[in-house]
Amino acid sequence: MRILLISSAYNGLTQRAHVELDALGHEVSITLALSPAEIAKAVALFEPELILCPFLREKIPADIWQHYTCIIIHPGIKGDRGPSSLDWAITDNVKDWGVTALQAIEEMDAGDIWASANFPMRSASKASIYRQEVTRTAITLMRDTVERVASGTFTPEPLDYAQDDVRGTLRPLMRQTDRSIGTATRL
């Protein structure tokens, strides 16, 4: 399958996705999401059968997600939306978290769900959790999603907050003030 990876950076997760998909025999190309024009150019040149976005901060242009299957790998549980998912999970001291593969649509992180899996959270830095649990889970979901797209018979699950397994919510970008630790003490 011709798979285009669109990423905000060629980070560890994107590199691992590249290597894993290549090892599975897929024809893989990568483009950085530098601008909507650069994304459109990469899509036109490569003509992918599937677009995977392992690490994306920007929106996919509508003229692309309307014509291609574009899957966003989101570091959050089903229903979780927003740019600071893992930050909020760590701050809220949740017991488990997850990764969701969802279809790109106009509303960020609100598309149909192609795959989702959870993992237990541990007491560690965001970077460590991202490099280990998030990356491992994301790679599994990307493999599952590629198989589902290739089958031509899989129907993704619409995001439905009425479902018991949809526990996430829309959260804002975490600001520095949200991360601060109270230093005031009483004498």
PLM features: residue spans?
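N-terminal beta1-alpha1 ligand-phosphate binding loop
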Residues: 1-19
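Structural motif
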Residues: 6-10, 33-34, 54-55, 185
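Short, well-ordered alpha-helical microsegments
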Residues: 13-14, 39-40, 59-62
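A short, Lys/Arg-enriched amphipathic alpha-helix followed by its capping loop at the start of a domain
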Residues: 16-28
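N-terminal beta-loop-helix "entrance" segment that forms/cooperates
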Residues: 18-19, 36-48
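A short beta-strand-loop structural module common to alpha/beta enzyme folds
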Residues: 25-38
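Short, structured active-site "lid" loops
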Residues: 43-60
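Donor/substrate-binding cores of folate-linked one-carbon enzymes
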Residues: 56-180
